[in-house]
């Protein structure tokens, strides 16, 4: 339930809500108003150790529960998530700021991840080859790996945790979850519903906090694997530190997603696609379009329509249904984004839509409106860096080849999109672009949960991505059995 009282957030360890043993807390504001809605503990190492001990004890019995039974338990959780969709979306809008429309979409994508986890009996099946030699059979068996942990960001407080713990738990593991201290309330509700579904205590544990919790997870000898989603510098740190301590790590990192606009595109649908990708969720997502490489032949027409449509977007509190762009997560992030916009102007880019001057319209929240630059080049910080905001850079290119070359020069390689009506162009793009997830006339090429999610280059550190068969492989280990009987 959403209330107006200021909440003191707790940890959930071994099936109980408990106060952190530490004394340090951090205020959690509503990004649309700046008003404090909660205080979250910055838990110390001792809290992580208690959570790991609880998960370790629970693993002894949970790992032996038959796979179909684990799946049936998740069906109960799935039903509760579906029954509480509206409430979950409202919590996301309250603490994250994204519009209720965007939050509702996130809830649905999270539910789809749990749907994947319920299909684990199929996904965990091994392989067998009889008669590999005279009287000898060979087979591969999959087993859970133990206690695993997830470290998740603020921008998708429901979807990303649900990428992790349901699938890991369905595979027979137990879990320690550390969500962003910026969005702790949704995590609380996810855990409440999880135990309402009847799971044994200790199977899922929640430890709120900041970097001390992260370091404790990475260094704890009883945690076998760590899943992470966040910025590139932190992802690199998590990967290097976790692997140094002998852990399996998947670390999904930053992005600078490019869209190539060809002269043969459907102009109206392309403009709406770019707007949806660049400005929905206030641009705070790793699959947002932040650069458009538009071919010269259509550039002026495309930009004119894009600017006109962008100027129609309303900025404000995500609970108001007419608003398209909500607030950024914190005042500090807003100031960082304004710094990038100022940098683009100073570097000589042409500011076509200025999202800085909107305070008189939206009040005291952490708002930056949709912003568009033209005349951007690779020497500018606004092209190089992940801004994580509703800021779009336009680069004019002569043809598809130049657009692909531009895209591949980025240090990131998460997602990339082409807008075209040519199958040949789409094929050339698909075969030559360096990105983990590719879209053809799809504004956000984030795959459904039954496909793997991961980028390339500085967008991903690890081997196996989240979701799909990658996720099952990450959360299990194989045993190869060669046997004969006398």
UniProtKB/Swiss-Prot annotation:
Official protein name in the record: Malonate-semialdehyde dehydrogenase
NCBIfam families linked to this entry: MMSDH
Catalytic activity: 3-oxopropanoate + NAD(+) + CoA + H2O = hydrogencarbonate + acetyl-CoA + NADH + H(+); 2-methyl-3-oxopropanoate + NAD(+) + CoA + H2O = propanoyl-CoA + hydrogencarbonate + NADH + H(+)
Subunit structure: Homotetramer.
GO MF entries: malonate-semialdehyde dehydrogenase (acetylating) activity; methylmalonate-semialdehyde dehydrogenase (acylating, NAD) activity
Domain of life, per lineage: Bacteria
Pfam families referenced in this protein's UniProt entry, alphabetically: Aldedh
Record-annotated active site: 286
Role noted for this protein: Catalyzes the oxidation of malonate semialdehyde (MSA) and methylmalonate semialdehyde (MMSA) into acetyl-CoA and propanoyl-CoA, respectively. Is involved in a myo-inositol catabolic pathway. Bicarbonate, and not CO2, is the end-product of the enzymatic reaction.
């Amino acid at each position: 339930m959403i209330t107006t009282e200021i909440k003191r957030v707790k940890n959930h360890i071994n099936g109980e809500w408990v106060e952190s043993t530490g004394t340090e807390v951090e205020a959690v504001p509503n990004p649309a108003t700046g008003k404090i809605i909660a205080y979250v503990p910055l838990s110390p190492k001792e809290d992580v150790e208690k959570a790991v001990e609880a998960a370790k004890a629970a693993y002894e019995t949970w790992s032996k529960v038959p796979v179909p039974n684990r799946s049936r338990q998740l069906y109960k959780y799935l039903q509760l998530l579906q029954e509480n969709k509206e409430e979950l979306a409202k919590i996301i809008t309250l603490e994250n700021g994204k519009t209720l429309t965007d939050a509702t979409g996130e809830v649905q994508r999270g539910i789809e991840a749990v749907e994947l986890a319920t299909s684990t009996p199929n996904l965990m099946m091994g392989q067998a080859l009889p008669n590999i030699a005279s009287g000898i059979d060979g087979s591969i068996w999959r087993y859970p790996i133990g206690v695993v942990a997830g470290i998740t960001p603020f921008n998708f407080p429901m979807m990303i945790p649900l990428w992790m713990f349901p699938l890991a738990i369905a595979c027979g593991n137990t879990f320690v979850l550390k969500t962003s201290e910026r969005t702790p309330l949704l995590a609380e509700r996810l855990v409440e519903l999880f135990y309402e579904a009847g799971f044994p205590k200790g199977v899922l544990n929640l430890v709120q906090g900041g970097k001390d919790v992260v370091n404790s997870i990475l260094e704890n000898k009883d945690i076998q694997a760590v899943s992470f989603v966040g910025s590139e510098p932190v992802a690199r740190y998590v990967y290097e530190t976790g692997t140094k301590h002998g852990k399996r790590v998947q670390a999904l990192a930053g992005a600078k997603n490019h869209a190539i606009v060809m002269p043969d595109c459907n102009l109206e649908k392309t403009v709406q696609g770019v707007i949806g990708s660049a400005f929905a969720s206030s641009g705070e997502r790793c699959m947002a379009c932040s650069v458009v490489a538009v071919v010269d032949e259509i550039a002026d027409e495309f930009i004119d329509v894009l600017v006109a449509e962008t100027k129609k977007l309303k900025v404000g509190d995500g609970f108001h249904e007419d608003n398209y762009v909500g607030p950024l997560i914190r005042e500090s992030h807003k100031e960082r984004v304004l710094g990038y916009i100022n940098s683009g102007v100073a570097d000589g880019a042409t500011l076509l839509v200025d999202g800085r001057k909107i305070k008189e319209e939206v009040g005291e929240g952490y708002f930056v409106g949709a912003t568009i630059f033209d005349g951007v080049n690779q020497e500018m910080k606004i092209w190089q860096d992940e801004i994580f905001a509703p800021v779009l850079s336009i680069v004019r290119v002569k043809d598809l080849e130049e657009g692909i070359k531009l895209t591949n020069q980025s240090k990131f390689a998460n997602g990339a999109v082409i807008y075209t009506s040519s199958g040949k162009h789409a094929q050339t793009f698909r075969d030559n672009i360096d990105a983990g997830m590719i879209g053809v006339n799809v504004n956000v090429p984030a795959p459904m949960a039954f496909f793997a999610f991961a980028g390339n280059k500085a967008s991903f550190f690890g081997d196996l991505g989240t979701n799909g068969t990658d996720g099952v492989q990450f959360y299990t280990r194989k045993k190869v059995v060669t046997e004969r009987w006398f």
